[in-house]
Amino acid sequence: MFTSGNVTARVFERQIRTPPPGASVNRARHFYENLVPSYTLYDVESPDHCFRKFTEDGLFLISFSRNHQELIVYRPSWLTYSTTDDSTTTLPPLPRRASKFDSFFTQLYSVNLASSNELICKDFFLYHQTRRFGLFATSTAQIHDSSSPSNDAVPGVPSIDKITFVLLRLDDGVVLDERVFLHDFVNLAHNMGVFLYDDLLAILSLRYQRIHLLQIRDSGHLVDARAIGYFCREDDELFLNSSSQAMMSQDKSKQQSLSGSKEDDTGENGLRHSLSQPSGSNSFLSGVKQRLLSFIFREIWNEESDNVMRVQSLKKKFYFHFQDYVDLIIWKVQFLDRQHLLIKFGSVDGGVTRSADHHPAFFAVYNMETTDIVAFYQNSAEDLYQLFEQFSDHFTVSSSTPFMNFVTSHSNNVYALEQLKYTKNKSNSFSQFVKKMLLSLPFSCQSQSPSPYFDQSLFRFDEKLISAADRHRQSSDNPIKFISRRQPQTLKFKIKPGPECGTADGRSKKICSFLFHPHLPLAISIQQTLFMPPSVVNIHFRR
């Protein structure tokens, strides 16, 4: 109805028109075309902290001290000041106090989370929005050794003496509960080894190949729900131990009935030793691995109707690669819903290195209720890619925060889908393109910003320089432009990290990070060099 697109026209349209069902949030987000962070305060006087992110509801700004010992939480506010200038044509200059960090943020508290030999993992943070709980992690130094102190540990996976997960109430900074993992390895970078779905928490132990499922109670306690790995059901261990004891007692009664000459033979063949120490010499596969092999076997068996062809197919596709399947370890895991997990399998080398592009990988869907594998794909499977292209939002778990449900993806945004198809058509090898796209699966939990300024139906920007993904990027001296989608030639605002006049030293490599508030026209850009001198903090807001 109104094509001008100014704020007055949009407000009037909102008064007289009702948006279609389910489109009220999208209609409201159109206001952000007019409310943009168009003003920048450069090199703001700020505390020397590592600023992590805004929470999903925008109530808190999470930061850590430079020594990675303390958590500092801020409450975003807004710049307020008065002026005696009666001019209506030009904006009055901001007072000097406006160039300070505490004009925009109020410190709520500071809490020491790490002991003397531990450090806070600055790349890890999960937010439970319903109760305003924050999950943090501390750890000791990583030990790079291939020796395994336990027979259950995977050789080649490094060890961390102590990993502590701390559940904290962000309203007042009270520590509610802790969970400690000793001599283990959990990938904490960018929340890769931990996934939060509603009140369920999944923690993947790479070293011991266990998925620890915990429940966050309303009281703030972490309660063990299940551990998936060697055992799949709660009573598996009890059943196996009772069966083992029955077998041992039966074998012992048989041995006692033998003659003295035969007792010496049984003492030499090692049978008793293997039964008395089942854990030390146990060659059984884990419960998850057995279910995976069983699913692969049945899938290959059902491909053919003739028994002769079935045997030939099993020899070629199953038995020939049997050891390769056995050697697979769990790399990453995410919830699809409260009953299903998406598990990524791969080699040991790919699980501990940062770049797993060249390592073979597989995806499995695991039903926690039936303890069965219900689907299995290779990382070059076209059918899995088709699901990923058409239903990407089903892989990114919905959140109770309304802002998180509108993060742009190629399954909910026509512009993102066009960009994906352009990249697909440009690719020389479709198989390599599929592998590259499926690298993002399983998705890291809470790894994208819900800010409307990353909505590609509203703004167009260079995704090589900035995006909704929670990652550091190489800094550029040129400002990042946000251009209107509705008016393709209209520049809405610019974001420039670093000093206003640029840096004199162009040789030093600079990285930057961007923290966008989920619903306010407010953003923080932090620029620093690789050698970590004091950061340059800019605040971008609407005047």
UniProtKB/Swiss-Prot annotation:
Question: Which key words are in the record?
Answer: Nucleus, Phytochrome signaling pathway, Ubl conjugation pathway
Annotated Pfam families:
Det1
Question: Which superkingdom heads the taxonomic lineage of this protein's source?
Answer: Eukaryota
Keyword Nucleus among record annotations: yes
Keyword Nucleus attributed: yes
Q: Where is this region: Disordered?
A: 246-283
Give the function comment from the record: Component of light signal transduction machinery. Involved in repression of photomorphogenesis in darkness by participating in the CDD complex, a complex probably required to regulate the activity of ubiquitin conjugating enzymes (E2s). Involved in repression of deetiolation in the developing seedling. Repression of photomorphogenesis is probably mediated by ubiquitination and subsequent degradation of photomorphogenesis-promoting factors such as HY5, HYH and LAF1. Involved in the repression of blue light responsive promoter in chloroplasts. May be required to stabilize the CDD complex.
**Motif range (Nuclear localization signal):** 421-436, 492-510
Phylogenetic classification of the source organism: Eukaryota, Viridiplantae, Streptophyta, Embryophyta, Tracheophyta
Please state which protein family the record places this protein in.
Belongs to the DET1 family.
Cellular location(s):
Nucleus, Nucleoplasm
Name it.
Light-mediated development protein DET1
One Gene Ontology cellular component term attached to this UniProt record is: nucleoplasm
Q: Which GO terms describe its biological process?
A: carbohydrate metabolic process; DNA repair; red, far-red light phototransduction
Polar residues biased stretches: 246-260, 274-283
How does this polypeptide assemble, per the annotation?
Answer: Component of the CDD complex, at least composed of COP10, DET1 and DDB1A. Interacts with DDB1A. Interacts with non-acetylated N-terminal tail of histone H2B in a nucleosome context.
Q: Which InterPro entries match?
A: 6-hairpin_glycosidase_sf, De-etiolated_protein_1_Det1
